């Protein structure tokens, strides 16, 4: 792993969280979809890898999950410890998790896998600390989406300092299946869909729009994908 590259990523996130705070991220409501997809229970022990300021952990904590988070950014860790005081928040590298084997029922990584310097090592670590019948949920960026194509390939706005990257649907499937995961379900990112359907009157939305839905376009064109996974050996 390139230490210099890792330090640049840490510095970028420290500056971003220090100056933008929670405004850098989607709102808390957007994280409700991950709670539903995982079907979280109060008995679950949850690890949020690259937890940021703790938006997902806050929701998990409210249903009495045992919550743990880790992030490389000191600014993010300070925010998370203040925002979710009931969670156990660690400063550390997601590619070398400081937790015992078989520790967690649920492992999530929301919008961060594509930023890891050593993706395979990060995935191996998440498998190591997860229990035998654990659930995994990852939000990852799609390199085939129209937005990515315009911003990154045409306008060249890719944030290389923050190690911003993406993969196609087939590439992500290959990454997960070749690194010890079974893919249970794949959904499009729910937040853009939630914003669109929010204009539909509530009484209609409640009857016609499912809480977790498959979008209006073929999955491969989604801006981001949500993967629900398990270990390959379970």
Where are these regions (language model features)?
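A C-terminal cap/extension of S-adenosyl-L-methionine-dependent methyltransferases
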Residues: 151-153, 184-234
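A conserved beta-strand element that flanks and buttresses the S-adenosyl-L-methionine
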Residues: 108
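Acceptor-substrate binding/catalytic loop of class I
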Residues: 154-171
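A short glycine-rich, Lys/Arg-flanked "PGG" loop and its adjoining helix->strand segment in the class I
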Residues: 120-132
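Conserved class I S-adenosyl-L-methionine
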Residues: 1-40, 43-52, 55, 135-159
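Class I SAM-dependent methyltransferase SAM/SAH-binding core
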Residues: 53-96
